Amino acid sequence: MSDSLWHLYLLRTASGMLYTGITTDVARRLAQHQAGKGAKALRGKGELTLVFHCEAGDRSTALKLEYRVKQLSKQQKEKLVIDQPRLLTTLFLAS
């Protein structure tokens, strides 16, 4: 599983909150969240909408990228949703 391609995703709750996560299968993970079997932070938050996702490389890179995105302000996350960049690794993890 370490060779799997990971993805970073953002979900919007009914109240407008943005949730950031990583997975190897975006559709499966969204279904888990919608069924209340995903992150506790999303339980009882109403309808969830996938508003952004992109490839994030291997698990290690995905975890680093997730951390960086979670540090962004809501305004910066909204810009990601609007701009829909295909690769965040070049934006956040460049040496």
Curated annotation (Swiss-Prot):
Superkingdom, natural source: Bacteria
Ranges for domain GIY-YIG: 4-79
Pfam families given in the database record: GIY-YIG (PF01541)
InterPro entries: GIY-YIG_endonuc (IPR000305), GIY-YIG_endonuc_sf (IPR035901), UPF0213_domain (IPR050190), UPF0213_GIY-YIG_endonuc (IPR022992)
Matching CDD domains: GIY-YIG_UPF0213
Protein family per UniProt: Belongs to the UPF0213 family.
Record-linked PANTHER family: UPF0213 PROTEIN YHBQ
Protein name, UniProt field: UPF0213 protein YPK_3712
Species whose genome carries this gene: Yersinia pseudotuberculosis serotype O:3 (strain YPIII)
